[in-house]
């Protein structure tokens, strides 16, 4: 496991940040690139907008501060909320890094010209398909959309293999999801990208007429299935694994069905972007490097049960191979049309 320490290197009046890696770090690791025009001096502080649950991310941020000496001021919220805030703040945002629950919000900011490029030495660590093509943001972890089902009410064979089947009247009042959640909105965006606007709207209209149970968060939706109050839920895979780690898999009334290749089973990523106003900032660069380090990737495996994106790190036990779930026709960089998806959901009363 890698250990980090922060050191400020002064050369000819130019300040750059270096993260010295000790122990078993693989050969070829490089220091963050200094800005090409005028280097920015580190002040040892970082302002982070985090679109992830504080209980999950705060321990990693604390470890980052311990390892680097960089203090982090974090603002937490949902990824859609923070995306909207960043668009409103524009170039005047105090944020230096945005950590998002999904690729769509990151793409939206990139489209607005509000992010700076991730240095190649970091971006190239993550396999193509799980990070932006133009290095406007970097993938951190992977997660799969799944259908959670109540094993006491629904057999695995009865669970649909595709989300299109959920508009069938037989599922009326039996399906739940959090429409305000970033991952759900990215799924609907993926539906628009893969199946076209007309088919996506037909699905949204159909599911809205099927009396869905609308919730605030993925975890709360899964809880309804586990307690026998809901038959099916559209959630991210790792919520089930978090609960199973606490109570044991055998105690879980809910089980999961993965949907390889279907828009409803899409693989999305959490990711991070450096805001345009923080271009070349050494503390922002240090945080990006930390997120894709072996240490942080292992943290996500052990604590959030997500897929690591850094090659060589094993996924949590029991998960299908990530590559087996990926739809090759879906480019995560195409999920940037978040506002159109929100408008579609609002049109049919889901937001």
Language-model segments: residues:
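Secretory targeting and sorting signals
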Residues: 1-28
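Short, low-complexity, disordered segments immediately C-terminal to signal peptides
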Residues: 24-43
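Extracytoplasmic ligand-binding site segments that recognize negatively charged/polar headgroups
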Residues: 50-58, 77-81, 87, 93-230
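A ligand-binding cleft/hinge motif common to bilobed small-molecule-binding domains
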Residues: 104-108, 231-253
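Periplasmic-binding protein-like
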Residues: 143, 173-179, 204-208, 213-215, 250-276, 290-314
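A bilobed periplasmic-binding-protein/Venus flytrap-type ligand-binding module shared by bacterial periplasmic
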Residues: 146-153, 192, 268-280, 299-300
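An extracytoplasmic/periplasmic, membrane-proximal ligand-sensing/linker region
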Residues: 198-200, 306-351
